[in-house]
Curated annotation (Swiss-Prot):
Keywords attached to this entry: Dioxygenase, Oxidoreductase, Plasmid
Domain AB hydrolase-1: 25-156
Organism (species): Rhodococcus erythropolis
Up-regulation conditions: Up-regulated by PQS.
Cited function: Involved in the degradation of the Pseudomonas aeruginosa quorum sensing signal molecules HHQ (2-heptyl-4-quinolone) and PQS (2-heptyl-3-hydroxy-4-quinolone) to anthranilic acid. Catalyzes the cleavage of PQS to form N-octanoylanthranilic acid and carbon monoxide.
Site (Increases basicity of active site His): D123
Protein name: 2-heptyl-3-hydroxy-4-quinolone dioxygenase AqdC2
Coiled-coil regions, chain positions: none
Annotated EC: 1.13.11.-
Family named by the database record: Belongs to the AB hydrolase superfamily.
Pfam families xref list: Abhydrolase_1
Active-site residues per Swiss-Prot or TrEMBL entry: H248
Enzymatic reactions: 2-heptyl-3-hydroxy-4(1H)-quinolone + O2 = N-octanoylanthranilate + CO + H(+)
Length: 270
């Protein structure tokens, strides 16, 4: 059941389900932009028997799509910490989809390895920002281009792997986000790549190394796998898994497989 809490002056919707087995951390599920916590509705049932699972919707991403002031990774991080403190979550592993990964890494940096011992990210572009994606996130910030940019991104994210549950999520559960949210997403994403170079560059700047895993289906190129192998060669705390999915939405498309990856990764330390 979805609950609501006002934190830092904004509405935050969340679900808090299950109880972690002895010695296991909670799992905190973070979405990308333009999704609310229902993105994880197919994954949570596979995790809740073993873990306490907290899923939240970012500010401005509640069911009413409440308009709020400007915000970015800093505010998303602060809201997440405030929620976890309020509901008594101490040690946890962030599980982040796409550009929610920037928040997961910021949480790790701010809270330290004792509270955030591991991070799992799904389907985030690990290279420097590709030119076509850079053009798309710039177009998201233009009133006359944002809808076409969003449509183009959605087409690439689906890659022909349309299913009824995924269509329901994209067309019904994810509707209602207007130019305000999509333009902000473009700016925040662009700013993150400009600041850090890439998510891997951000990982290298963490104050304390800890195990980080990236699981992904896109893009389907050998050079992308080689990038991950090379990064692990420099940083043994990093690992990756390529998934057999077709879309950019693994928690929706492959919930059982993602749950297996999460359990294996978290249980390495327990």
């Amino acid at each position: 059941m979805t609950a609501l809490m006002t934190l830092n002056g904004v509405r935050i919707e969340y679900q808090d389900i299950g109880t972690s087995s002895a010695g296991k951390p909670a799992l905190v599920l973070l979405t990308g932009w333009g999704h609310d916590l229902r993105y994880y509705r197919r994954l949570i049932p596979h995790l809740a028997p073993e873990f306490r699972v907290v899923a939240l919707s970012w500010r401005g991403h509640d069911a009413d799509r409440t308009l709020v002031g400007d915000y970015g990774v800093h505010e998303q991080t602060a809201d997440t910490i405030a929620l976890l403190d309020a509901i008594g979550v101490d040690v946890f592993v962030p599980v982040a989809h796409a550009h929610g990964g920037w928040v997961a890494l910021q949480l790790a940096d701010e809270l330290g390895v004792q509270r955030v011992p591991r991070v799992l990210i799904a389907d985030l572009i690990m290279t420097t920002i590709p030119s076509d994606f850079a053009a798309a996130v710039r177009d998201l910030q233009k009133p006359d281009r944002w809808k076409s940019a969003r449509a183009g991104l959605a087409k690439s994210w689906l890659s022909g792997g349309v299913t009824l549950p995924l269509l329901k999520h994209l067309l019904i559960e994810s509707r209602g986000f207007g130019f305000d949210t999509w333009a902000r997403s473009g700016r925040v994403i662009e700013d993150a790549y400009n600041r850090w170079g890439s998510p891997m560059g951000r990982m290298e700047q963490l104050n304390e190394p800890r195990p980080i895993r990236h699981v992904f289906s896109h893009p389907k190129t050998s050079s992308y796998d080689e990038l991950h192998v090379a990064f692990r060669g420099r940083h043994p705390w990093f690992s990756h898994r390529r998934l057999a999915g077709r879309t950019h939405f693994p928690a929706h498309e492959l919930p059982r497989e993602i749950a297996t990856e999460i359990r294996a990764f978290v249980n390495e330390s327990t």
